[in-house]
Amino acid sequence: MNLKEKTRALFAEIFGYPATHTIQAPGRVNLIGEHTDYNDGFVLPCAIDYQTVISCAPRDDRTVRVIAADYDNQLDEFSLDAPIVTHDSQQWSNYVRGVVKHLQQRNNAFGGVDMVISGNVPQGAGLSSSASLEVAVGTVFQQLYHLPLDGAQIALNGQEAENQFVGCNCGIMDQLISALGKKDHALLIDCRTLGAKAVSMPKGVAVVIINSNFKRTLVGSEYNTRREQCETGARFFQQPALRDVSLEAFNAVASELDPVVAKRVRHVLSENARTVEAASALEKGDLQRMGQLMAESHASMRDDFEITVPQIDTLVDIVKATIGDQGGVRMTGGGFGGCVVALIPEDLVPAVQQAVAQQYEAKTGIKETFYVCKPSQGAGQC
């Protein structure tokens, strides 16, 4: 049973009538452009074929009822006429409530909804299960009530909900790629203007995601520290964001900056340049150049931004040794664990999977999880 069939069957069973719509929104992997989004820079993610699926129907009153199929069919019920506040015990509910609360502030022309939610985006792996949920919920209301909101607005609404209601400080990339993703393409996103350019992926190339299964612990506190260091760097250059600082300007005065801040700034500036170049390398089908840029990105995250861990570096080394210059591999996501992403010819996937299976656990004591993904379509009816 796929997610659509599962949620539709559950909807009929629990609510006693059939769902009218089924909506999906995908997770994502970022191919290159790490910690650039909150510096108003560029990112190059693609949506993946793991998603949140919601079967739903409009109600003729002001009640929202939500079933979380992946959490033992837990129910959340709230009214659109009362102030929407956080749920005491069900964290998943807060993503739904936050999206609805912020939608009300954007466009209040909607009524109640019944929905059943299920997803297969791995949680805690840095593949944006939360953004996928936020965009799916926003799309449900937009589709059921024909709200005049485009994908970028649904994405922004999800980001606001996560920042202000859930209380997690995220950039805009995850929601934007979930809303706007395009099949067989990556998206070069300008995080300042929210402009997005579809970049075709070379034929016969697999997007491989390998979860290190190293439990991320530092991610919240260290993420916020990195943001502060970047803001300090932007202030030093008297610019609104590091996006506005050139590598030349930085190199001329790098020695005057706090040495740690200087390393953080150098990562962001060089990563922005790499990301823009990577988009044109992908478009040309130049997997070799893409691989070099991914390697430089990983080294920069390891040495300048200092967000990798030995387990992640080990995974990258194993993959790199197997593929040589046929493609690329790097850590992806916020850091301190999580996943690596590799772009490799499809015929090399078995060799990579075998090498990782033979070496990673032997070296780290942790068993990896291996995903082969396709660049997929963004949110909509399914």
Swiss-Prot record:
It catalyses: alpha-D-galactose + ATP = alpha-D-galactose 1-phosphate + ADP + H(+). The active site is at D174 (proton acceptor). Its main location: cytoplasm. ATP binds at G124, A125, G126, L127, S128, S129, S130. Keywords: ATP-binding, Carbohydrate metabolism, Cytoplasm, Galactose metabolism, Kinase, Magnesium, Metal-binding, Nucleotide-binding, Transferase. Mg(2+) binds at S130, E162. PROSITE patterns: GALACTOKINASE (PS00106), GHMP_KINASES_ATP (PS00627). GO terms for molecular function: ATP binding; galactokinase activity; magnesium ion binding. Pathway: Carbohydrate metabolism; galactose metabolism. InterPro entries: Galactokinase, Galactokinase_bac, Galactokinase_CS, GalKase_N, GHMP_kinase_C_dom, GHMP_kinase_C_sf, GHMP_kinase_N_dom, GHMP_knse_ATP-bd_CS. One of its GO terms (cellular component) is cytosol. The record marks R28 as: Transition state stabilizer. Substrate binds at E34, H35, T36, D37, Y223. Its EC number is 2.7.1.6. It is found in: Cytoplasm. GO terms for biological process: galactose metabolic process. Catalyzes the transfer of the gamma-phosphate of ATP to D-galactose to form alpha-D-galactose-1-phosphate (Gal-1-P). Belongs to the GHMP kinase family. GalK subfamily. HAMAP family: Galactokinase. This is Galactokinase.
